[in-house]
């Protein structure tokens, strides 16, 4: 059985036992998180209002920061060059089960 969940403005396909990185969530490592399912698949497909009855239980594994990316700006002819970096915060969660 798998489910589609939405958190941080993104959708993820998850199954029991998966560890995924999502946008930063509240809570310490070891805390339990409950997410609503948008779609449930497997032996029987459930979506729409019926999928709202299903919940996905997850546990916070860790908080961290992603790999650094660099953004460069350049304008020709005027010697304008800028480089900035960015590291996105994330939360790793482990999917414990899909219930509904």
Curated annotation (Swiss-Prot):
GO terms for molecular function: rRNA binding; structural constituent of ribosome. One of its GO terms (biological process) is translation. One of its GO terms (cellular component) is ribonucleoprotein complex. The keyword Lyase does not apply. Keywords: Ribonucleoprotein, Ribosomal protein, RNA-binding, rRNA-binding. It holds the Pfam family Ribosomal_L21p. Binds directly to 23S rRNA, probably serving to organize its structure. Belongs to the bacterial ribosomal protein bL21 family. Part of the 50S ribosomal subunit. Contacts proteins L15 and L20. This is Large ribosomal subunit protein bL21. It comes from Deinococcus radiodurans (strain ATCC 13939 / DSM 20539 / JCM 16871 / CCUG 27074 / LMG 4051 / NBRC 15346 / NCIMB 9279 / VKM B-1422 / R1). The lineage of its organism: Bacteria, Thermotogati, Deinococcota, Deinococci, Deinococcales.
């Amino acid at each position: 059985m798998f489910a589609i969940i939405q958190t941080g403005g993104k959708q993820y396909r998850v199954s029991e036992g998966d560890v995924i990185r999502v946008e930063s969530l509240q809570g310490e490592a070891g805390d339990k998180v409950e997410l609503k399912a948008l779609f449930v698949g497997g032996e029987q497909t459930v979506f729409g209002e019926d999928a709202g009855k299903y919940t996905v239980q997850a546990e916070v594994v860790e908080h961290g920061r992603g790999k650094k990316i660099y953004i460069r700006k350049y304008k020709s002819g005027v010697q304008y060059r800028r480089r900035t970096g960015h590291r996105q915060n994330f939360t790793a969660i482990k999917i414990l089960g899909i219930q509904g």
